[in-house]
Amino acid sequence: MLPARLRTFFFPTCLVAFTALVTAFKLQDALGLLPCLLCVTQRALLAGYVLVCLSAVLHGLALEGQRRYAQLALGFALGGAAVAARHVWLQGVAADDLVCPVAIDHNAGQYWNELARQLFSGAPDCNALTWSFMDLTLPEWSLMAFVLLAAFALGHLLAGRLHALLTHDLKQR
């Protein structure tokens, strides 16, 4: 049986992240949206977050192992938030101001550093406002999801730190 601490953090956050990932794929399929390079990167980071949380649930590690998994999950969430924030910013820029005029299909054979440069330079397909719900675009929803997932991981890290400080303080008395 898994410790209660793992069930209360990693399993629910895994479900939240998995739901967000499935929703992104379902929206793409239902609305016929073509994902740009930033969308694909956000989904990869979200999938990484899901895998980290799922691994933490399956491993059932002690407090130190949980902390490492939470740090890794926080890294994926912050990376996803950075990519989503960049995507939101690019959607506010005029298409003529984008540096990269080449779509993702043409970038596949290039080196990783060139691909990374073009990832953050932007492409015309990253600028398109193709869908919104409650006046928020899909990258804005992704940004909110990544911030929420980062808050979950950070909360777990801070709670573990507070627990360690309190137990250390009680041992000294």
Describe each region flagged by the PLM.
Residues 120-173:
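A hydrophobic membrane-anchoring alpha-helix module
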Residues 1-8, 34-40, 61-68, 130-137:
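Juxtamembrane loop-transmembrane helix junctions in multi-pass integral membrane proteins
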Residues 3-15, 61-83, 151:
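Interfacial segments of alpha-helical transmembrane regions
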Residues 91-137:
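Extracytosolic (periplasmic/ER-lumenal) interhelical loops and adjacent juxtamembrane/interface segments
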Residues 1-48:
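Transmembrane alpha-helical insertion/packing segments
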Residues 27-30, 59-63, 90-97, 155-166:
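Juxtamembrane transmembrane-helix termini
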Residues 32-79, 172:
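Alpha-helical transmembrane segments and their immediate interhelical/interface regions
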